[in-house]
Amino acid sequence: VWFGFTSFAAKGPAMGRVTGKVAVVSGAARGQGRSHARMLAAEGADIIAVDLCADIETNEYPLARPEDLDETARLVEKEGQRAFTEIADVRDRAALSAAIDRGVAEFGRLDIVVANAGICPLTAGLPPQAFADAVDVDLVGVLNLVHSSLKHLQAGASIIVIGSNAAFMSSMNTTGIDGGPGGAGYAFAKIAAAHYVNDFALALAKFSIRMNAVHPTNVNTDMLHSAPMYRAFRPDLKNPTREDAEPVFPVVQAMPVPYVEPEDISEAVLFLASDAARYITGQQLRVDAGGFLKVKPWSGA
């Protein structure tokens, strides 16, 4: 005991930071979603993992497959936790709600909501449907997951929305990237999701339910390493490769890195999900290697 506080060393065997909790993660089959599910499981949470596991026509790069979701479940179970998986489209409120209900029936509770599913149809020349698809997944999908989870949440629950550094840019063209209608839809969706977190967090606060957003920069996932993203960063080339595009990736960060790892985002998710963040709500946490600092001048605290 030191100044009235018990030292960590005196508390006995360490427990995971989310031991005994249950988390639902959308877009859990691969990339950031898999990383979030695995890290939460490593810290003691059981996982309800949902994913579309199919492609979307205007999104040029391939999305996850059922076997990817199975692998996420295997990794969760390898951490000693239970996994409930279901193929579900975040754009379909009824189907998503039913999937969550089944997961909660299996595990008995729901404490953590991670709205991670997203697409980035960042290809110039696509039809207007690309804007609609980006908004339907990246904004409506967030609302559907959160609203379908509400009836299961009690005081102490934590909702985390995975946004994007694009939420703090005036448009996708801030960095010289022409993303077409899909890129514009992506930026709009992320801006709107950030505003949603701010306003809904205030409404949830009196129920002791917390809500925060995490805004990554480039993340080392399949979304970044895709043909449309390479073309966005190297519009001077017809068919740029990773080797062509990667030297340009650092343009959106202040720190000299091309991207961050999925685990860097998962660490923020884990913190916000844990009781260590019990009084943190309504925040826009940027894990962006200083990207925000490059596009937004200081305007006071």
What are these regions (language model features)?
Residues 8, 256, 269-270, 281-301:
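Short C-terminal tail/terminal secondary-structure segment
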Residues 16-54:
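Canonical Rossmann dinucleotide-binding motif of NAD(H)/NADP(H)-dependent dehydrogenases/reductases
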Residues 119-123, 160-206, 217-220, 226:
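Catalytic loop of short-chain dehydrogenase/reductase
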Residues 151, 202-203, 278:
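Alpha-helical segment proximal to the catalytic Tyr-Lys
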Residues 205, 210, 280-282:
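Short, small/polar-rich loop/turn modules that mediate ligand/substrate recognition or access, typified
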Residues 238-243, 253-265:
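A conserved structural motif in NAD(P)-dependent oxidoreductases
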